[in-house]
Amino acid sequence: MQDTPDAHAHFGWFKRRRHLKVDEITVVDKPMLKRAVGAAALGNAMEWFDFGVYGYLAVTIGQVFFPSSNPTAQVIAAFATFTVAFLVRPLGGLVFGPLGDRYGRQKVLAFTMILMALGTFSIGLIPAYERIGIWAPVLLLLARVVQGFSTGGEYGGAATFIAEYSTDRNRGLMGSWLEFGTLGGYIAGAGTVTALHMLLSSEQMLDWGWRIPFLVAGPLGLLGLYMRMKLEETPAFRAFAEEAEKREHDRPGLGALFQVHGRQLLVCMGLVLVFNVTDYMLLTYMPSYLSVTMGYAESKGLLLIIIVMLVMMPLNIVGGVFSDKLGRRPMIIGACIALLVLAVPCLLLVGSGNDGLIFLGLMLLGLALVCFTSSMPSTLPALFYTPVRYSALSIAFNVSVSLFGGTTPLVTAWLVERTGDPLVPAYYLMGAAVIGLVTMLFVKETAGLPLRGSPPAVGCRKEAAALLMSDAPVTVDPDLPPLPDVADPEQVKPAL
């Protein structure tokens, strides 16, 4: 196998150690890295602020937009609208991913921020069902579609952006800040809803109080847009783009993406499945499960979830450090095993009716989730090569979230209603854990290694020189995968 040119159309950079030169090693700009992490995490926080608010207001939203004599039916209708946004996420990934691979990660992430803020802000302006009838849920549905389309390019782009800006040694730590933003967004959303429940009467919440969290998205979006517009493009993309422009006709199209990288796409979908089923089960579905299924006071359930997330935030950063030191595989495999062993006991604790035992059950699930949230943002981008990273990650991530993660609240609520078994969420988590364990059989350890398709990334010139003198690998794979027969021009033309 020969070394590739500096920017192979399908695989990006690939060289063997004996041909590597010190000036080819990326030296990361630390101040720019911090700004990149902050801007990416803020965008993710805003996305999950909205999802958290919607999940914690599901009962209220059901009453405002879906009048019914059955409270459970209202919650299911609200979660159905919540789920619709996930159905359009793959379309967003299909559009924004190739754009990010061709024109740059920074430009696309700025645009997704605008759309996300507009979609969330507009929800706060929609009149209730009693005022405009059927148009209320229709407008809510349209706003959720805008949100879903924009978020289709958000996580894949943000994870790619942080991964490509980070050094190889601390990519896990830097990536963990992305999910720190997720938890921060959830806490901000849940905290706002909880404060509103405590300060306002039920009538005030139904009348206007529920609108406040959505209207906050406007100024948050402007702040996020400003931060992202001040960023530079990632070093990995700049290095590839300069050479790729000389061979425009060689850019891999979507057909080649699925043919060459199909296995990694499936692996990514499996990892995202177990990650997001756990995420949405705990952070989005549990508040409604506690109040509707278990008859627990709504404000108390929200408060317990907030406390769990507050504990998870610093642990997420610690988990990022561990993923760099111990590896991504031990973290993810350990979390899957924990779900298999603890899911049923945790749900029994949650259903006990005792505040302390409920918190213990939720916290144990939160600890398993931390192992995912701290390691996935560095694991998923490392599955793919630089020329297709944004496209592949966005498509695989959003298809998996749409089919499995985002549907978790709706499917679980429906199954609990149909079966009458309060342990259904535990069985659901155990099934996801099995899929996660099987998927990990096909995942290589990437901690401390360069991203596929990118040269090694270090913190200073001294580290670059030391890398050349060491025996440390400079690529994840010893060889590149073989290219299929791409005689069909549709397979080699640009994706967009």
Residue ranges and their predicted role:
Residues 67, 114-133, 337-353:
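C-terminal ends and interior cores of transmembrane alpha-helices
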Residues 132-152, 356-371:
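Hydrophobic core of transmembrane alpha-helices in multi-pass small-molecule transporters
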Residues 58-91, 138:
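Extracellular/periplasmic helix-loop-helix junction of adjacent transmembrane segments
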Residues 93-105, 316-328:
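Helix-to-loop junctions at the C-terminal end of transmembrane segments
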